[in-house]
Swiss-Prot record:
Residues 1-43, 94-117, 179-215, 277-289 are extracellular. It is a multi-pass membrane protein. It comes from Homo sapiens (Human). It is found in: Cell membrane. Glycans are attached at residue 23. The chain crosses the membrane at residues 44-64, 73-93, 118-138, 158-178, 216-235, 256-276, 290-310. The gene is OR13A1. PROSITE patterns: G_PROTEIN_RECEP_F1_1 (PS00237), G_PROTEIN_RECEP_F1_2 (PS50262). Belongs to the G-protein coupled receptor 1 family. Keywords: Cell membrane, Disulfide bond, G-protein coupled receptor, Glycoprotein, Membrane, Olfaction, Receptor, Sensory transduction, Transducer, Transmembrane, Transmembrane helix. The keyword Transmembrane applies. This is Olfactory receptor 13A1. Odorant receptor. CDD domains: 7tmA_OR13-like. Pfam families: 7tm_4 (PF13853).
Length: 328
C-alpha cells in the first residue's frame, strides 16, 4: 500500500447538518480528473500507458510462469519474487484498464462501486508489496549474514507462512479502510483530482466526519511506512556490514550481486512514495501525487521484471527453456 501520508490534508471542516443533507443527492459516481487538463497529450499518454501496461503484464506473467514450472527456481528468493510479480499484476491491472478507457473515450466517470473496488484491490496489492519488500530484505539478510543456517531460517513452511501472512494481513487492513470509506456519505462535488481512486482525495470529498478514517490512516502510515522502512534499512545495514568483512573484492562483488536487484527495487519504490506523500501541507501538489502514482502503479511493475531478470542467469535460463523464442 502506498503510504497515506496525505492524511495531513484531512483537516477539520464544517459538515452539513442532517437537515441540509436530506435535501442533497448522494453521489453515485465520481469523475476522475486524470490528465484532462492536457487534452493535447491524450494520444501520446494513451500510447505510453498501453506500452507500459503491456510490458508490465508480459514481464510479470513470464516471471510467474518461469518460476512456477521450473523446479530449480523454487528457492525462497524466487518464491517471494513470484508473489511480487503477482502483486504487480493486480496493482497495475486495478487502475490501467480504466485509465486507458478514459483516454480513448474521454469518459472519465467511474461508478461508486467501481471506485470502491478499485480502491480495495490497489491498496491490497500496493500494501502487500511494501510488506513483501521487507520480507525479501530479511531473506537477503539470512542468505548473506547466515549462509550456513539459511536453509533452516528460510524453510519452505516458514516462507509459505510469511507470504500467507502478508496477503491476509493486507487484505484485512484494506477491508477495514474500504469499510470505513463505505460508511461515508458523498454529497458533491465528485471530482477526484487523480487518475484513479485513492483514500485521501475521497476523504476530502466526503460530507461525513472522516475523523476515524484519519486515525486509521495514521496507524497504517506508522506500520506500512515507518516500521517497514526501518526494518528494511536494518536488514541492509547488517548486509553491508557482512559484505565489508569479506576479504576479497570478488567475494564482496558476488555477495552484493545477490541483493542488488532487490535494493534497486526498494529504492525506486520508496523514492516514488516518499517524493509525493511525505511533505509539509504547503508543499503538497496534485501533480506530484499523480507522478508518484504513475511511478509505483505503472512504471515500477514494468521495471521490476527487467531489474530482477537482466542480471539473473537462472531466471533467463528458465525463460529460454520454457519459451524457445528466448534462445535467440
Amino acid at each position: 500500500m502506498k503510504l497515506w501520508m496525505e492524511s495531513h490534508l484531512i483537516v477539520p471542516e464544517t459538515r452539513p447538518s442532517p437537515r441540509m443533507m436530506s435535501n442533497q443527492t448522494l453521489v453515485t459516481e465520481f469523475i476522475l480528473q486524470g490528465f484532462s487538463e492536457h487534452p493535447e497529450y491524450r494520444v501520446f499518454l494513451f500510447s505510453c500507458f498501453l506500452f507500459l501496461y503491456s510490458g508490465a503484464l508480459t514481464g510479470n506473467v513470464l516471471i510467474t510462469l518461469a518460476i512456477t514450472f521450473n523446479p530449480g527456481l523454487h528457492a525462497p528468493m524466487y518464491f517471494f519474487l513470484l508473489n511480487l510479480a503477482t502483486m504487480d499484476i493486480i496493482c497495475t491491472s486495478s487502475i490501467m484498464p480504466k485509465a486507458l478507457a478514459s483516454l480513448v473515450s474521454e469518459e472519465s466517470s467511474i461508478s461508486y462501486g467501481g471506485c470502491m473496488a478499485q480502491l480495495y484491490f490497489l491498496t491490497w496489492a500496493a500494501s502487500s508489496e511494501l510488506l513483501l519488500l521487507t520480507v525479501m530484505a530479511y531473506d537477503r539478510y539470512a542468505a548473506i549474514c547466515h549462509p550456513l543456517h539459511y536453509s533452516s531460517m528460510m524453510s519452505k513452511v516458514f516462507c509459505s507462512g510469511l507470504a500467507t501472512a502478508v496477503w491476509l494481513l493486507c487484505a484485512v487492513n484494506t477491508a477495514i479502510h474500504t469499510g470505513l470509506m463505505l460508511r461515508l456519505d458523498f454529497c458533491g462535488p465528485n471530482v477526484i483530482i487523480h487518475f484513479f481512486c485513492e483514500v485521501p482525495p475521497l476523504l476530502l470529498l466526503s460530507c461525513s466526519s472522516t475523523y476515524v478514517n484519519g486515525v486509521m490512516i495514521v496507524l497504517a502510515d506508522a506500520f506500512y511506512g515507518i516500521v517497514n522502512f526501518l526494518m528494511t534499512i536494518a536488514s541492509y545495514g547488517f548486509i553491508v556490514s557482512s559484505i565489508l568483512k569479506v576479504k576479497t573484492a570478488w567475494g564482496r562483488q558476488k555477495a552484493f550481486s545477490t541483493c542488488s536487484s532487490h535494493l534497486t527495487v526498494v529504492c525506486m519504490y520508496y523514492t516514488a512514495v516518499f517524493y509525493a506523500y511525505i511533505s509539509p501541507v504547503s508543499g503538497y501538489s496534485a501533480g506530484k501525487s499523480k507522478l508518484a502514482g504513475l511511478l509505483y502503479t505503472v512504471l515500477s511493475p514494468t521495471l521490476n521484471p527487467l531489474i530482477y531478470t537482466l542480471r539473473n542467469k537462472e531466471v533467463k535460463a528458465a525463460l529460454r527453456k520454457l519459451f524457445p523464442f528466448f534462445r535467440n
